[in-house]
């Protein structure tokens, strides 16, 4: 039993962070305090504030502390530790993806494109957008309104005539001389920039002025083009919510909670425009106070490595926060400008908050129904296989084109559904092209020839294939030399049936040495189809990326001595990949940074491709 009195005797009254551990030396809770001694003493009073705290204290084996120079520093360290340890008694944001932006590049002929990651390229970034779909929708809209290129530089640099986008009026073809002047092109770029900044009226005023000027000059064809563009922009503006207020950059958050499940709805507003909304379902320990949930979510959302999320000027929440001022100060320090958290708003901000609340409740209801269906399907599969419980399932699939660029996928499901953070892909090498058996064997070896923690050992492993694939998998497990219990997983083959149609799958159960044909309406079959389809899609997407990479590689990547800078110089000075391939030895040697010896290597390599 934890001797808290002895522990507290050595704790100081300084600010800092504390980590609580269980008897397995796992971090079960991370917290911070302005006064560590006072805060930690509160856990060991007779009357605790909640059942959650009671359960936490009962699990404590030992505690360690780390002093910080300020409470703000402690708050930041707390969120970093939560991300690192994922303690079961903390609220956990289960979303680790970076957010997409729209990038307007800084070039002679700028392009508009989607971008995800650190802002390392020169240009202007607009966003973040809640998901890739919102970016694609905005890019499609911009293409219809402003004929600014969206193509990659490798395409732009190697055009000899305009592409289809020019033919359908969605690009002005700056790639080919004589179609649009730099001045005309940059006018459209500026209009796109203003539109992304939410300055719609400036866009309209400019276009109306240009239309009237063209009419005065009797250039009625040009005036008609401006008229059509004005109508298109007005049509878009009319569909958007028009606020009487000048809204700042802000995120609006609302929380709905029911039956142990929480939904945080975040609405993103930038430059006065609603970029979209997104639902988050953080892992919430039982009996967690919703104000604590809001506070923890805000901290994790903006502070845990940022994940490409820009911190807005204002964050609107629908709960009172106990540590609002500390959180504001930390976000202000991170953003390098004043950031406020608002708990009470009026006007259009209040309308947006109400909208976020409605969306949070609706998304929570959908999630609850999905969770209920998932639970029913899990129980049906348990009954089918005579298993008391299934905590973790993994499924493998193989994808290739004519035996090339072979990729294996492994997807993971727990009792809540897909566990995407544990998904994996494996590049398959050194086998005969098209040998799916060998590919499956290599994938299983890569996955399981290593130490696995107890909670990472799957109860079921699905193999997408018939008896041949399953037998190869059984052979792999027979020869595994590992410390974990390799006999625990049930290996099950999922064959597609005689007609290879959905609903006619045959399950081949290795441990029971039997085949099962399930009816179309079987809940167990629906779960198996779900995980099998996830694995199939994951394998295909990985294969497509690998195939595209192989297709777009210049051939220079494999040449020793040709790094990124030299490759870029070759493509730039010789007019792209085709120019490099057609170049003579002397022309290659004339490129800055390319010696005669290296030029000979490049010339011979490309000639023999």
From Swiss-Prot:
One of its GO terms (molecular function) is excinuclease ABC activity. Keywords: Cytoplasm, DNA damage, DNA excision, DNA repair, Excision nuclease, SOS response. Residues 13-91 form the GIY-YIG domain. This is UvrABC system protein C. It is found in: Cytoplasm. HAMAP family: UvrC. It comes from Haemophilus influenzae (strain PittEE). Interacts with UvrB in an incision complex. The UvrABC repair system catalyzes the recognition and processing of DNA lesions. UvrC both incises the 5' and 3' sides of the lesion. The N-terminal half is responsible for the 3' incision and the C-terminal half is responsible for the 5' incision. Gene3D superfamilies: 5' to 3' exonuclease, C-terminal subdomain (1.10.150.20), GIY-YIG endonuclease (3.40.1440.10), UVR domain (4.10.860.10), UvrC, RNAse H endonuclease domain (3.30.420.340). Belongs to the UvrC family.
């Amino acid at each position: 039993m934890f001797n808290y009195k002895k522990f507290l005797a050595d704790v100081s009254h300084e600010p800092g962070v504390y980590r609580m551990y269980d008897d397995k030396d796992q971090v079960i809770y991370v917290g911070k305090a302005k006064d560590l001694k006072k805060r930690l003493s509160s856990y060991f009073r007779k009357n605790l504030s909640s059942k959650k705290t009671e359960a936490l204290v009962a699990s404590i084996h030992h505690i360690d502390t780390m002093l910080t120079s300020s409470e703000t520093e402690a708050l930041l360290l707390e969120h970093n530790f939560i991300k690192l340890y994922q303690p079961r008694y903390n609220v956990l944001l289960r979303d680790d993806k970076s957010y997409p932006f729209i990038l307007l590049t800084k070039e002679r002929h700028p392009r508009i494109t989607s971008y995800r990651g650190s802002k390392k390229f020169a240009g202007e970034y607009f966003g973040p957008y809640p998901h890739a779909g919102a970016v694609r929708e905005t890019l499609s809209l911009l293409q219809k309104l402003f004929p600014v290129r969206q193509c990659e530089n490798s395409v732009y640099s190697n055009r000899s005539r305009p592409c289809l986008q020019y033919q359908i009026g969605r690009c002005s073809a700056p790639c080919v001389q004589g179609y649009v002047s730099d001045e005309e092109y940059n006018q459209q770029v500026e209009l796109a920039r203003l539109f992304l900044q939410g300055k719609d009226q400036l866009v309209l005023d400019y276009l109306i002025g240009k239309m009237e000027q063209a009419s005065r000059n009797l250039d009625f064809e040009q005036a008609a083009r401006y008229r059509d563009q004005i109508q298109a922009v007005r049509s878009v503006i009319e569909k958007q919510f028009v606020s009487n207020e000048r809204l700042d950059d802000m995120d609006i958050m609302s929380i709905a909670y029911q039956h142990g499940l929480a939904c945080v709805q975040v609405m993103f507003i930038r430059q006065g425009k609603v970029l979209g909304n997104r639902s988050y379902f953080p892992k919430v320990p039982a009996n967690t106070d919703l104000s604590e949930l809001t506070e923890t979510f805000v901290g994790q959302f903006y502070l845990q490595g940022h994940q490409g999320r820009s911190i807005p000027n204002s964050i609107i929440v629908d709960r009172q926060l106990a540590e609002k001022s500390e959180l504001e100060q930390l976000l202000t320090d991170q953003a390098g400008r004043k950031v406020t958290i608002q708990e009470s708003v009026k006007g259009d901000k209040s309308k947006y908050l109400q909208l976020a609340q409605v969306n949070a409740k609706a998304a929570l209801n959908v999630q609850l129904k999905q969770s209920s269906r998932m639970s029913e399907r899990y129980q049906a599969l348990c009954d089918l296989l005579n298993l008391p419980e299934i905590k973790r399932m993994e499924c493998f699939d193989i994808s290739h084109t004519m035996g090339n660029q072979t990729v294996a996928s492994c997807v993971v499901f727990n009792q809540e559904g897909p566990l995407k953070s544990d998904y994996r892909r494996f590049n398959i090498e050194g086998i005969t092209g098209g040998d799916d058996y060998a590919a499956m064997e290599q994938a299983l070896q890569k996955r399981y020839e290593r130490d696995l923690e107890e909670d990472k050992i799957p109860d079921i492993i699905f193999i997408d294939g018939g008896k041949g694939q399953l037998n190869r998998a059984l052979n792999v497990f027979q020869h595994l030399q590992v410390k974990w219990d390799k006999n625990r997983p049930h290996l099950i083959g999922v064959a597609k049936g005689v007609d290879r149609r959905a609903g006619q799958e045959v399950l081949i159960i290795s441990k029971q040495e039997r085949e099962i044909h399930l009816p179309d309406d079987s809940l167990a079959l629906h779960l198996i189809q779900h995980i099998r389809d996830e694995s199939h899609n994951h394998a295909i997407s990985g294969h497509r990326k690998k195939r595209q990479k192989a297709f777009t590689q210049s051939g220079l990547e494999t040449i020793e001595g040709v790094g990124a800078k030299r490759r870029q110089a070759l493509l730039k000075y010789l007019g792209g990949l085709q120019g490099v391939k057609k170049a003579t030895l002397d022309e290659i040697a004339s490129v800055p940074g390319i010696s005669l010896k290296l030029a000979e290597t490049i010339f011979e390599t490309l000639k023999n491709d």
